Amino acid sequence: RDAQESRGLGDVYKRQVRKSLPAEFSYIIQELLHESTIEPNKHAYINVIISTIISTRRADDFIIAMCNLIQRLTIDSLHIVGDIYDRGPGAHIIMDTLCDYHNFDIQWGNHDILWMGAASGNEACMANVIRLSMRYGNLGTLEDGYGINLLPLATFAMDTYADDPCTIFAPKTNFADSTYNEKTLRLITQMHKAITIIQFKLEANIINRRPEFGMGGRKLLEKIDFERGVFVYEGKEYPLRDTNFPTVDPADPYRLTDEEQELIEKIHYSFMNSEKLKKHMRCLFTYGGMYLVCNSNLLYHASVPLNEDGSFKHVNICGKEYWGKNLLDKIDQLIRTAYFDEDDEEEKRFAMDYIWYLWCGPDAPSFDKDKMATFERYFITDKSLHKETKGYYYALRNKEEICDRILEEFGVTGQHTHIINGHVPVKTIKGEQPMKAGGKLLVIDGGFSKAYQPETGIAGYTLVYHSHGLQLVQHDPFQSTQKAIEEGQDIKSTTFVIEFNSQRMMVKDTLSLIHISEPTRLLSISYA
């Protein structure tokens, strides 16, 4: 059966098949692919090959090789529209696979950028990464994947919050990567509170250092009346859900205690000396970017900031205005500067701070909301303060003319052009649809992360682009590999035809071949 599947896929691109064959079984697979029913002796020959594989106890290895080959031939190129590191467990396992993958690219999401900021040395990004891991009970990526030493944080948290129930910081165990006992859950809860308070302090230091970010209103510890246990915001008082702040000095709320400073230095050392993290981040930099234009499709994770009238929003960076394509190009350059630049210390420092801004800044294309209400969601019961207002892009992207304007800005032209978007999960249980603007824009973030699935009702989308057109595959939630084996469950998916081309697209019409054909044409002219 595997050989038949491979043969069917292999008939399309024969040279590509030969290049893709696993060296160990290359000769055998080629023989199976060219099996003929016309020659009777050939059939007996094939049977001997199969019998030999079984008798030499290589059947399992051969089946695995065939399965990998089928996957390899099915997907010529994999495009990931961001957020490998969004909340769910096993991001390091995904990155291990991608680092060895034959052909992929990624358009960085805000969660990816947060990890890139942590790997660049931004301590506020490190604190955010750890806080999110604690909140969702996913410690495996940090500890097992990257060897981040969380023992100093555990020791600090146990000492500082020994008698504190830390109730509001209990992890969301429904989405945890392991089953934790009561003692471990108690420790994670304390660690969660400890790193959250440190995060608020570190972020305030960036805001003080970069007034041009315009985020002074997000320094919220100073708005607490510690004696009365209330949060004072715009003249109104809100009771706090937690009033124990042993490490916060009301007179200087953003100063790290000596113990917190020592702790963050140890965390910094651990992040900066993780070889696996360095390898994975280099992979993200090598194969990633803020956006990609591919075969008349424009791919980016979140948004291109817009004004209310649909014009491109101008964003000031270091005294210069950027918008549209040049804004995303500038941000791409800043992210790389933060990680790689060792020559200009001030330029690198600004770029590192800006990576944090990309995580939660109102004019950041990777975020594009008025605020990230982290403090409010933890400490304030009143949900009116939890609201995060999206930028104008998210309302205007439903209009075809707006999508055409964005596509034109990025030089994407042709009859069948699309924007491929992610970032905001499609809540199908509320009737939301992934297709917008008459099919010009496709939102394919449906929530692979289990944390989103109760909101979306599905487990994400895969967009398939082939010679006949576009297909959107909607996935149902997948329980576990164990259940799939024991109960014969598979990943259930529903396929929708988005666009059908009566005349199939040829390989020569794809972007990669267009780039090759132009120099070939010039060579032909030169030769003539």
Feature locations, PLM:
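Feature recognizes metal-dependent phosphohydrolase scaffolds
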Residues: R1, S6-S517, R521-S526
